[in-house]
Amino acid sequence: MRNQLLFALAFIPTIAAAASNCEVNVSAGDSMAFNTRSIDIPKSCKEFTVNFAHTGTASKAGMGHNWVLARSADVNDLAKAGVEAGIDKNFIPPNDPRVLAYTPLVGGGEKTSVTFKPSILKDGESYSFYCSFAFHSFMMRGTVKLVD
């Protein structure tokens, strides 16, 4: 009985940390893949931070990566518009309200982050994150969900 209680108590700090976690670490390397395919954002978070790291060796101009949040229905059109915007604008169409949050492009070994208010996300809507570097979005994509 005592061992069962100790076993159960061992998980309490983990559960509490997960419940109050309002940031996530995301990375991508030269293989053009994020280290995660989904991110859960607690509705209780006033702000949420994405810490992004390019774990590869390729330069920003050669194969930069970033993290962009948008409604899933908008990602393909945003990716096309991003190619037109070019690398100087992080392959992000300037002042486009469909872009909900993003990090700048970074090259191998570099890190960046973005903080946003989860209140911009609506219940029942489908959201995705992707890399906006030219033509990366088709392989580098994941889902974002609001969770209780």
From Swiss-Prot:
GO terms for molecular function: copper ion binding; electron transfer activity. Residues 19-148 form the Plastocyanin-like domain. Coiled coil: none annotated. Cu cation binds at H65, C131, H136, M140. Its main location: periplasm. It comes from the Bacteria. Disulfide bonds join C22-C45. Gene3D superfamilies: Cupredoxins - blue copper proteins. This is Azurin. It comes from Methylobacillus flagellatus (strain ATCC 51484 / DSM 6875 / VKM B-1610 / KT).
